[in-house]
């Protein structure tokens, strides 16, 4: 494992390309079933949940784990990347924050895939949905458990399905431990980029760390985990650190 240092945001561009390509591909792959038994409705909803969960993990990853950015961030290529450290303040997000941000993303975007079940309603069925509640657990993978009531009715008959689950093969605790160690070490020399230390940390964590210099005083850090895959694409997690180069080395 190794560090790649560059002044052009190649690593970030790759992450954006993957996210765009992944989403476009999945748009084509989502199929609306032509038949309307409960099994088909359940399968369609499950496929949307799986797709949106993967997209949420990928999208939040290239924005430092956030769906809605914190107050301090830098905007790069339409992405709002949070500062985890600015020379004084430690703004590293705990796991519960990353879980909440994933839940926001899924809840906000799920209906983009479900399309309000219009293909069912067009057949004369009535569909009612309740609020989405999520339980997200971080381990070697991300485990999503959802309570999402979907009631399908026709004349005097109705049926409700309400529990769904999926997992995404991304090791978030490993990512959290990596960025927390980077920030703790950065506090020792707030205005010094610790290339040697980052090399050692990348080897220890079995990740790749890419640095991209932007905006004169900011550096983007991208942690790439080849063992955490979303449809065979390595997971990427990007955050920013702000430096005062007039005090470099201090």
Feature-to-residue mapping (PLM):
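N-terminal positive-inside, membrane-proximal cytosolic segments immediately preceding the first
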Residues: 1-2
């Amino acid at each position: 494992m190794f560090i790649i240092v560059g002044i052009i945001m190649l690593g970030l561009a790759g992450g954006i390309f993957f996210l765009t390509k992944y989403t476009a591909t999945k748009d084509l792959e989502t199929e609306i079933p032509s038949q309307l038994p409960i099994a088909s409705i359940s399968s369609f909803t499950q496929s949307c949940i799986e797709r949106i969960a993967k997209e949420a993990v990928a999208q939040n990853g290239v924005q430092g784990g956030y769906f809605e950015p914190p107050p301090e961030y830098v905007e790069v290529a339409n992405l709002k990347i949070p500062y985890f450290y600015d020379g004084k303040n430690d703004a590293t997000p705990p796991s519960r924050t990353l879980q909440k941000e994933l839940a926001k993303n899924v809840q906000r975007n799920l209906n983009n895939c479900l399309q309000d079940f219009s293909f069912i309603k067009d057949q004369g069925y009535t569909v009612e949905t309740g609020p989405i509640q999520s339980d997200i657990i971080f381990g070697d993978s991300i485990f999503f458990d959802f309570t999402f009531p979907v009631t399908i009715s026709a004349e005097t008959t109705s049926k409700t399905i309400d529990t769904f689950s999926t997992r995404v093969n991304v090791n978030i605790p490993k990512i959290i431990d990596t960025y927390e160690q980077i920030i703790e070490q950065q506090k020792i020399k707030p205005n010094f980029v610790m290339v040697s230390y980052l090399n050692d940390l990348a080897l220890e964590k079995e990740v790749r760390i890419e640095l991209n210099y932007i905006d004169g005083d900011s550096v983007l850090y991208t942690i790439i985990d080849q063992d955490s895959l979303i449809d065979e694409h390595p997971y990427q997690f990007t955050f920013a650190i702000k430096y005062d180069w007039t005090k470099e080395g201090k």
